[in-house]
Amino acid sequence: MSESEIPGQVVVDLEADQSAEGGRRMVLNMGPQHPSTHGVLRLLMELDGENIMKCVPDIGFLHTGIEKEFEEKFYQQAVTLTDRVDYLAPLSNNLGWCLAVEKLLQLEIPPQAQWMRVMLTELTRLNSHLVWLGTHALDIGAMSVFLYCFREREEILKIFELFSGQRMMTSYFRIGGLALEPPRGWQQRVKKFLDVFPSRIDEYENLLTNNRIWTGRTKGIGFISLEDMLDLGITGPMLRAAGLKIDARKDAPYSSYEKFDFEVPTSTDNDVFARYQVRVEEMRQSTKIVRQAMEGMPAGAWKADAPHVVLPDREKMKTQMEALIFHFKIVTEGFRVPEGEVYQVIESPRGELGYYVVSDGTTKPYRVHMRTPSFGNLQAVPKMVEGSLIADVIASIGSMDFVLGDTDR
């Protein structure tokens, strides 16, 4: 069997030949087991000395067929699948799925549930950005920042554990509201974090922003034109670092985001350093949103009054036969969703996350497709690194903040 006939083999026209300077070109394989690709990403690069002449990303190593799995699950069961797509921002994926199905059901969500969703997804954004900043800094040689970022991330994970019992795969949002009543004392835990975190962001910036090594490795590196970004469908902090103020929370508000006061950070330099600046400022804005949600949290129900969709309270099940019947039917048979199709967009930490859901009127979705930001953003790799030095590849791909589960699905 020839190389071109091997199943799954990526055939790339990269051949070592004579360079213009009379030297030899070399084909370098980076990944898929490489610590700085942050997942199973493979890059095939053609080098002329230390210059990258051509780069081809090879993805798909983390493909799970998760979109097909949706078709075999009841709508309420599929929430747990969404956690596994972008595993650094599970609540963002929970929210996108729930909003899409709720739109098909024309289900009205109580204000407290909406605000709680906003607060927790912004904490998720902070969690994700902390992982990005810590690992990105570590890749470039700043180990202290990595340790400090994970120190703060630990406090956020403790908040998630308080709400859901889980640190990462939380599955805390449900179609119709939340999975559980918000726990006692959550305000004190969140306030304790908010009182400390702004000074921690200052600490990160003091270590990096004016650091000559950091600026030397990030300024003017990883440039890609705005036209190319739009052609490739790049969204999120990468696009905002190129000067476009596009954010679904502002442009297409959902879950009461229109009631919150925050800014959308942008830059115009469009390099690795600009993406760092945008994400750091996003952490400040997310902290601002979390505080507004905590202090202005509406009173009332934390899930919709829809017994055919939302599981009844445990106390009602002990005393009301009707509640017990509804619980049994939802768990064993699911609930029917009106026939139709919907596309719901939210702003995940990595960019525009869209859920396209088709219902045929049964208890399981007919088709689900996710427009994940990591897949689009990863298309920028060749444009970003070709013509640059091999030493700058790690900084460039680190600035994209992609998640391979989000890319491969």
Swiss-Prot record:
Subcellular location: Cell inner membrane
UniProt keyword terms in alphabetical order: Cell inner membrane, Cell membrane, Membrane, NAD, Quinone, Translocase, Transport, Ubiquinone
Function description: NDH-1 shuttles electrons from NADH, via FMN and iron-sulfur (Fe-S) centers, to quinones in the respiratory chain. The immediate electron acceptor for the enzyme in this species is believed to be ubiquinone. Couples the redox reaction to proton translocation (for every two electrons transferred, four hydrogen ions are translocated across the cytoplasmic membrane), and thus conserves the redox energy in a proton gradient.
Domain of life where this protein originates: Bacteria
Species this chain originates from: Solibacter usitatus (strain Ellin6076)
Its membrane topology: Peripheral membrane protein
The protein's name in its UniProt record: NADH-quinone oxidoreductase subunit D 1
Gene coding for it: nuoD1
Catalytic reactions of this protein: a quinone + NADH + 5 H(+)(in) = a quinol + NAD(+) + 4 H(+)(out)
UniProt xrefs under InterPro entries: NADH_Q_OxRdtase_suD, NDH1_su_D/H, NiFe-Hase_large
Cellular component terms per the entry's GO annotation: plasma membrane
Principal localisation: membrane
Coiled coil: none
Enzyme class: translocase
EC number: 7.1.1.-
Stated family: Belongs to the complex I 49 kDa subunit family.
GO molecular function: NAD binding; NADH:ubiquinone reductase (non-electrogenic) activity; quinone binding
Subunit: NDH-1 is composed of 14 different subunits. Subunits NuoB, C, D, E, F, and G constitute the peripheral sector of the complex.
